[in-house]
């Protein structure tokens, strides 16, 4: 699917977010690439979430498994509850080798307050 995006002249995360942040942009990308709008929305939310310092792909996968799929969802979470949920999930699913500390999870939540949310549903 990366090839499809490149053919549509989407070669960077920044460009992708500029286009895929809006419903109309996703519709255009869907038309040009054949990638579904829900999938593009999911990717856009993930890319926006990964703007948070020290929150890479593996931790984003773990957050998603814990029910956090966007910056706005992360903002509303209680750090202790989220960390506990992430631990339980990771014990079963082994998504990350090293669990983030409660301090790091709290910092993600704090840092999420500073992210300008551009992705609309």
Name what the model sees in each region.
Residues 1-121:
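C-terminal extensions
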